[in-house]
């Protein structure tokens, strides 16, 4: 596969491409920001211009998360193995070696330079200020809130590092899900990378399938016809990782007379990603659109390193990348690796599915690799005045990478937009170009040997090869719009969105979270803010409504079956919730549903496109074969739970926790697969389930006369550093489901009893 190792010696240990904290870096001047921190460490940053605003953002973020950002920059630079060795994983669960190779390829100098050149002056100034503010904090850091101080990877940062993080974010919906596959791509007969075993690719595929759940969301925008006060109302409930490069951070940004926006941002971004302003609130949910396509290459029979397009033989480009790996003796060795690229994009290999053999190979084209507008897009959204203005800004720039946008404004408008960067293929070409076998497995794959299957170009699109805004779903309503990571189809059942390219949106069964939301939103009764809040805090397991009555019937029919006794008793006592005091029946139910989902024909009422809100429903116990399979599924689930040692009287809050230091904080919520609106992802760790993702930043915004009223919290707290006073404070609030007022006006901010002020200049 073209990987080779070269010893670089002890000198390499001392040389780094990131400068140390104390390095004599050129420092910008004329920087100024005022920061006010309110309760729970939320910074309210005011500056006269973008450079000063970025300066304040970088400083405030470093105070809470310097170690997190520094490590994520190490990842985005492809330097994990240099500092941590080849063993270990990134926050995205990628092994260090393939992670480094992938990001060294993704963030090559020419790509960063092109990205920087495409930025507006305002965005450049935000980035320059951010880097300067972060570096200032590092120069002053005393270790009180920076536990990694003194580590060689905690370094001063440059604007290029922030671009690396941005590009990493961009490809989350595309080639980033294929990092292992890109690293493993090698011609037939070439040496294979040792880390590319079949098991590794099963894990990689599972990671890709989990993308929409772990980076999912719920969103509801209510308009004047349904809100109790006749104005707009928005619930933002994004489900994101609780650590790493996708960990949200609360902040409030102000440039007097030009900008006043509050919400949450991802690490390294000098903009608010989800938030609200004086007259507008917006949020995002991961969409179902395709943001990449695979291309099956017909290889030249004479040479598997060449491929055919319209009968012409073209050579694969070999792109060499190099990384450094720290050995057990502390010495660095240089590893070189070849990435193979076609006119469509890099080659990828998944054994048994996307193979590179003598006749064919697969390439991947990611639409967001050419999306240089993403930062400009969010900064533009931050300045939008109402729903109509936001829509114009999004449709003009087309810089949203892989999410839907939902918004509500003071005038009572509710908006849904499936406006993201999506490949464009003219409808008449899709039947001939698509590869049905892979499409059926959820992989948008096209024929690469026919140039007509290359992405179509429309002059109305903001980027060559993407779908123009006019051909993407938009719905403006005065009652409501909602989304929980389903397609655009049933955003509001009264106005189905249909007839779009299969790359954009398809009419497929909606998930249980959306069914739960729509069950609460149907009707004409006025909706109060409390109603939306309770949809989250109720922690109701919607799938139990569809399945549990029949499951308990099966229990009654098999009362003498010892293997089912404990499970049936727990299920009978369960409250159909994922609350802290919910019983162990929820554990049995989850394990059962994982097996039930694999059964064919087990639903009493299968999905019916004419009744999408009511189906599927029930278990077909009247069919003997189904009854037998379901009984076995429950018995297997019971055996798994009982083997884990969970006591009969265990509560959900005893099992699902977030560990902070030596203490465990009980966390409500559960797997969104089962219709828990407060979706929480947790993994087994010893005798408990440790939360790794799910509900993150919450905002519920209304628009009374005196200004926006927002309630919410940041579930995992502002700081990722154990030494910070804001490492666990909001997590405890989340455990108790105590949403807080988010202070927006100067009056609210200055009245906060925990107010702290700081002015920084240089």
Swiss-Prot record:
The active site is at residue 217. The keyword Cell membrane does not apply. It holds the Pfam family Penicil_amidase. It is found in: Periplasm. GO terms for molecular function: hydrolase activity, acting on carbon-nitrogen (but not peptide) bonds, in linear amides; identical protein binding; short-chain fatty acyl-CoA dehydrogenase activity. Heterodimer of an alpha subunit and a beta subunit processed from the same precursor. Residues 1-23 form the signal peptide. It comes from the Bacteria. This is Acyl-homoserine lactone acylase PvdQ. It catalyses: an N-acyl-L-homoserine lactone + H2O = L-homoserine lactone + a carboxylate. A variable cleavage site between the alpha-subunit and the spacer peptide was observed: Ala-194 may be a part of the alpha-subunit or the spacer peptide. This step of the maturation process may not be very specific. Its EC number is 3.5.1.97. Catalyzes the deacylation of acyl-homoserine lactone (AHL or acyl-HSL), releasing homoserine lactone (HSL) and the corresponding fatty acid. Possesses a specificity for the degradation of long-chain acyl-HSLs (side chains of 11 to 14 carbons in length). Degrades 3-oxo-C12-HSL, one of the two main AHL signal molecules of P.aeruginosa, and thereby functions as a quorum quencher, inhibiting the las quorum-sensing system. Therefore, may enable P.aeruginosa to modulate its own quorum-sensing-dependent pathogenic potential. Also appears to be required for pyoverdin biosynthesis. Keywords: Hydrolase, Periplasm, Quorum sensing, Signal, Zymogen. Induction: Up-regulated under iron starvation conditions. Residues 194-216 form a propeptide. One of its GO terms (cellular component) is cytoplasm. It is an enzyme of class 3 (hydrolase). Its main location: periplasm. The keyword rRNA-binding does not apply. GO terms for biological process: antibiotic biosynthetic process; bacterial-type flagellum-dependent swarming motility; pyoverdine biosynthetic process; quorum sensing; response to antibiotic; single-species biofilm formation. Belongs to the peptidase S45 family.
């Amino acid at each position: 596969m073209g990987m080779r190792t070269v010893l670089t010696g002890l000198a390499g240990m001392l040389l780094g491409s990131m400068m140390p904290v104390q390095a004599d870096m050129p420092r910008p001047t004329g920087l100024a920001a005022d920061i006010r921190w309110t309760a729970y460490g939320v910074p309210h940053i005011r500056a006269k211009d973008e450079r000063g605003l970025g300066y304040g953002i970088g400083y405030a973020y470093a105070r809470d998360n310097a170690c997190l950002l520094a490590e994520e920059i190490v990842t985005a630079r492809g330097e994990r193995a240099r500092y941590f060795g080849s063993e270990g994983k990134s926050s995205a669960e990628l092994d260090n070696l393939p992670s480094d190779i992938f990001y060294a390829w993704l963030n090559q100098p020419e790509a960063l330079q092109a990205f920087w050149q495409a930025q507006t002056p305002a965005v450049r100034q935000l980035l320059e200020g951010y880097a300067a503010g972060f570096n200032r904090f590092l120069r002053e850091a005393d270790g009180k809130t920076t536990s990694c101080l003194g580590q060689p990877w905690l370094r001063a940062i440059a604007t290029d590092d922030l671009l690396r993080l941005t590009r990493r974010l961009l490809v989350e919906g595309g080639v980033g899900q294929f990092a292992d596959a890109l690293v493993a791509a090698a011609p037939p007969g070439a040496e294979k990378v040792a880390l590319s075993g079949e098991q590794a690719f099963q894990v990689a595929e599972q990671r890709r399938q989990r993308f929409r759940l772990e980076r999912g969301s719920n969103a509801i925008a209510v308009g004047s016809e349904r809100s109790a006060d006749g104005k707009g109302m928005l619930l933002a409930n994004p489900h994101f990782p609780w650590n790493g490069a996708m960990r949200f951070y609360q902040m409030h940004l102000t440039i007097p007379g030009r900008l006043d926006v509050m919400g949450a941002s991802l690490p390294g971004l000098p903009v608010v990603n989800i938030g609200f302003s004086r007259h507008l609130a917006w949020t995002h949910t991961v969409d179902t659109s395709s943001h990449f396509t695979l291309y099956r290459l017909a290889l030249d029979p004479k040479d598997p390193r060449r491929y055919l397009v319209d009968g012409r033989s073209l050579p694969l480009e070999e792109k060499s990348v190099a990384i450094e790996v720290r050995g057990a003796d502390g010495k660095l060795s240089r590893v070189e690796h070849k990435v193979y690229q076609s006119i469509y994009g890099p080659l990828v290999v998944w054994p048994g599915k996307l193979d590179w053999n003598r006749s064919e190979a697969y390439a991947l084209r990611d639409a967001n690799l050419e999306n240089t507008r993403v930062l400009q897009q969010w900064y533009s959204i931050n300045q939008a005045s109402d729903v109509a203005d936001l829509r114009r800004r999004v449709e003009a720039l087309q810089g949203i990478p892989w999410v839907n946008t939902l918004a509500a404004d003071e005038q009572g408008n509710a908006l849904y937009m499936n406006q993201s960067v999506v490949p464009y293929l003219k409808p008449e070409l899709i039947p001939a170009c698509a590869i049905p076998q892979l499409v059926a497995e959820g992989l948008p794959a096209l024929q690469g040997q026919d140039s007509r299957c290359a992405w179509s170009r429309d002059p109305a699109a903001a980027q060559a090869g993407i779908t123009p805004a006019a051909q993407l779903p938009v719905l403006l309503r005065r009652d409501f719009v909602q989304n929980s990571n389903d397609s655009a189809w049933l955003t509001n059942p009264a106005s189905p969105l249909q007839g779009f390219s299969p790359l954009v949106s398809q009419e497929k069964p909606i998930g249980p979270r959306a069914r739960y939301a729509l069950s609460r939103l149907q009707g004409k009764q006025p909706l109060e803010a409390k109603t939306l809040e309770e949809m989250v805090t109720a922690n109701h397991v919607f799938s139990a409504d569809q399945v549990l009555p029949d499951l308990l019937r099966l229990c009654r029919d098999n009362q003498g079956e010892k293997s089912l006794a404990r499970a049936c008793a727990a299920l009978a006592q369960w409250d159909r919730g994922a609350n802290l005091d919910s019983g162990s029946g929820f554990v049995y139910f989850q394990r059962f549903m994982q097996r039930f989902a694999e059964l064919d024909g087990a639903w009493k009422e299968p999905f019916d496109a004419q009744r999408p809100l009511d189906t599927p429903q029930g278990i077909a116990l009247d069919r003997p074969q189904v009854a037998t399979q379901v009984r076995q599924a429950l018995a297997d689930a019971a055996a798994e739970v009982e083997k884990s040692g969970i006591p009969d009287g265990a509560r959900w809050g005893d099992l699902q926790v977030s560990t902070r230091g030596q203490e465990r904080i009980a966390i409500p919520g559960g797997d969104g697969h089962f219709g828990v609106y407060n979706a929480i992802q947790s993994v087994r760790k010893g005798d408990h389930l440790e939360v790794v993702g799910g509900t993150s930043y919450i905002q519920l915004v209304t628009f009374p006369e005196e200004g926006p009223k927002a309630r919410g919290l940041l579930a995992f707290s502002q700081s990722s550093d154990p030494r910070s006073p804001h490492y666990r404070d909001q997590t405890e609030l989340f455990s108790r489901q105590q949403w807080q007022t988010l202070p927006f006006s100067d009056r609210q901010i200055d009245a906060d009893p925990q107010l702290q002020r700081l002015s920084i200049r240089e």
